[in-house]
Regions:
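Conserved N-terminal phosphate-binding loop of PLP-dependent enzymes in the Aspartate aminotransferase
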Residues: 1-395
Length: 395
């Protein structure tokens, strides 16, 4: 299979891991040789309830027995999408009550950027250095990492960048700014949390000049940080929230939410101002509804912080300089990218899946399913420490 994978399926890098997957269950993935791997990555924060969660699987099967795709988004009332948006509105702060469903996080970013221009009539966007909001042309334009963008320029004009947590840079938000887009916790940059009320101060500046605050919850959202949404940790209510990854329990989905008066602008002058064929797909929406119910009806969110504490207690080693992040959005920081690479490959050989972050080579991604058990955390951390010990004594 690996040969065909490389020959027929377009790749994202010259050296993919190319594990041949047989099946997955709970916190484990199994390859075609029968080897079992503990998953500390969760499909890059997407499989929030682990693999083959019974509630999500049953919701998908039940919906498949009724109907699948029947019409483009926004024309027919379909129960899974309606019920999901209704439940999401219940958990969103006022006035964020209307949601547009799309197929991925980057689509959600694109929709939010269009919405900001439509609401404000302005063209400028502000983002942060080392920010990541997706990889299509609009979302790439607000990506804060030039090395990944240069080959695709020209991108959107009138985009400026500030440094995350730099209060002086907030003054760059002006009456020309349509929106500033921020991750509630910077992901690709190394799981960096906002400090000293940074998000609140950004929102205050936006209100002063009439700009919108778009908060990217694609990775932090749906319980990963100890709150349903990351922004809830920082005493701020955004104007637009963008979502993806964990909201579908492993299924492909994205969404953006804002107040009704803003969202209604996308349906008139012009009509069909934002459209999608498969957004709100009933099978995917059923998975989203089951996922949101499971996250909010159990103790998964509160347990996220308990599990974070356990990770921090266990991941102590001379080669680990710091553990960054919040909840189950964690990164073990080491001195060099070479150490990161060696740890990831050693751990995979030992049956533990780890991964990289986009823009911070010294970070080892630890984003397991929210459902991971304490015993599984101990099992995985023991493997990490074993790999680090081998490297440490080899020095």
């Amino acid at each position: 299979m690996k040969e065909d994978f490389l020959k027929y399926q377009a790749q994202t890098s010259p050296y993919p891991l190319a594990m041949e997957v047989s099946h997955a269950k709970g916190s484990y993935i199994y390859d075609t040789n029968g080897k079992k791997y503990l998953d500390f990555v969760a499909g890059v924060s997407a499989c929030s309830l682990g693999h083959q969660h019974p509630r999500v699987n049953q919701a998908i099967k039940d919906q498949l027995d009724k109907y699948s795709h029947v019409m483009v988004y926004g024309e027919y009332a379909q129960n899974p999408a309606v019920e999901f948006c209704k439940l999401l509105a219940h958990y969103m702060p006022e006035p964020l009550k209307k949601t547009y469903l799309v197929n991925s996080g980057t689509e959600a970013t694109e929709g939010a950027l269009k919405l900001a221009r439509r609401v404000t009539g302005r063209s400028q966007f502000i983002s942060c250095h080392n920010a990541y909001h997706g990889n299509t042309m609009g979302s790439m334009s607000v990506m804060g990492f030039e090395e990944r963008k240069q080959a695709f320029r020209p991108l959107l004009p009138d985009v400026d960048f500030i440094t995350f947590n730099n209060e002086e840079d907030i003054a760059k938000i002006t009456t020309k700014t349509a929106a500033i887009i921020l991750e509630s916790i910077q992901g690709g940059a190394g799981f960096i949390q906002p400090e000293n009320g940074f998000l609140t101060k950004v929102k205050e500046r936006c209100e002063e000049v009439g700009a919108l605050l778009i908060i990217d919850e694609i990775q932090p959202g749906f319980g990963r940080t100890g709150k349903l949404f990351g922004f809830e940790n920082y005493n701020v209510i955004p104007d637009v929230v963008i979502m993806g990854k964990g909201m579908g329990g492993g299924m492909p989905v994205g969404a953006f939410t804002a107040k009704s008066a803003y969202m209604d602008l996308l349906s008139d002058n012009p009509k069909l101002g934002h459209i999608t064929t498969f957004g709100g797909h009933p099978v995917i929406a059923a998975a989203c509804l089951a996922t949101l119910r499971e996250i909010t009806e159990t103790d998964l969110i509160s347990q996220t912080l308990v599990k974070e504490k356990l990770f921090r207690e266990l991941l102590v080693h001379p080669l680990i300089k710091e553990v960054r992040g919040k909840g189950l959005m964690l990164a073990a920081m080491v001195e060099t990218p070479e150490i990161t690479n060696e740890v990831i490959f050693k751990c995979q050989d030992k049956g533990l899946i780890l991964f990289w972050l986009l823009f911070e080579g010294r970070a080892i991604r630890i984003t397991p399913p929210l459902t991971i058990s304490e015993e599984e955390i101990k099992e995985g951390c023991a493997i990490i420490l074993e790999a680090l010990e081998e490297m440490y004594h080899k020095k």
